Amino acid sequence: VPITTAKRIFWDLLDNRSMNPLIKSPELLLPAGSLDKMRAAYDFGADAVYAGQPRYSLRARNNEFKIEQIEIGIREAHERGKKFFVTSNLLPHNDKVRTYLRDIEPVIAMKPDGLIMADPGLIMMVREGMDKGNYADVPIHLSVQANTVNYMAVKFWQKVGVKRIILSRELSLDEIEKIRQECPDMELEVFVHGALCIAYSGRCLLSGYFNRRDPNQGTCTNACRWNYATQPSAENPNTGEAIPVAMDKNFNFNQAQEEAEQSFAACGGSARHPEADKVYLLEEAGRPGQLMPIMEDEHGTYIMNSKDLRAIEHVERLAKIGVDSLKVEGRTKSLYYVARTAQAYRRAIDDAVAGRAFNPNLITELEGLANRGFTSGFLERRPSQDYQNYETGHSDIGHSHFVGEIRSIENGWAEVEVKNKFEVGDTMEVIHPSGNHRFKLEKIHTLQGEELTNAPGSPWQVRIPLEERFKGALLARVMAGVGGAATA
């Protein structure tokens, strides 16, 4: 998506800008699952992106970055004054250790701005190669997969030669601040948006157990988000195992859960959960008859579907703490997701640095994206139900729906590459680096000028009336009943 305004070019030139002397502007780091998504991230305000080879970057599927795309990405990033980090955070078995150096050597020669790594053995191998002069001296960033949760671990990795630590998602704001105080000269990176894994920073075995697809090899099947039925159980007096019991037809599980939560809240959340000693059996929809014992205590349920992380309201605090980079998860997400999250977090960072109050409309903009419900995760300590989505394992559509890309505009008519259906009378939103604009769609034409009542979806191309200044924008349909300003 090309940048057409002097405003965005001006801000691009001011790297590490800071209008408030007390706050340094943190880097905004976006995911790139393809070159188009990388370009959109930069256009909408990202300072850097991360991407990696499918074999080594925990994204074996839906990942377009082969060696040729990585080379193009690094070159384009540097031409724009941006950064490109190569994700190489696999926890490899022996067969991949043998091939790793062979495959990473040409990537290092391209001089990315950093290698995101998790495995100590691979880090040692790369550092030894750099120390011997075999490779260019590329900074190493420690992946969130390494589960760094305290300042002594940060100091250890600093001695090893790591330049940046991507802190574990399980840390609170106060814990992050303590690490910054104890490690003032180490770069710190924090996730602020995206999917949350129910395991400790992604170290999960559910997918491997159910499907023999190892999440730590980049093939997670998201078993935590499947549909599970709950059945009461009793203890077998002979074996001690949990066995299913006939559920009372008058038993209301939702009511029992609500009563348990009320009881827990009444004791201040510090006592033992009333349901802690009860064992239930879970039955996954695709595995009838395979019953798994499950317990819930004050920390939650250990097979569950987490809400998505959204920490845009904490950007100012993170900037004041001195976090160097704010990171968005989502290499498999859409170009629309990349553009909207980059735009929202860019505004939040710029407002914080300029001393402006947080704009709550940014939360509304992010709620327009498909999501599983939002939580601030462990940044703030909240009851367990605030972290979890008990009702559905898929993302809800949000209040705006990505429907197309503006390819060109001529004589007041925009050519749209249609992605999803929209029709005359819909409220539309144009998403552009210079600002967004809402309007009611009055006409749709074919490329030949024939009138249409709707654009059926991909792979259609249609024309709609639109101002010239929105060339290269994205187009969304605003769902009924959603308000908001016409421009932002």
Predicted regions and their residues:
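Extreme N-terminal basic, low-complexity initiation segments
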Residues: 2-8
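Active-site pocket-lining/capping segments in soluble small-molecule metabolic enzymes
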Residues: 20-148, 166-170, 174-325, 332-407, ...
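As written
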Residues: 161-162
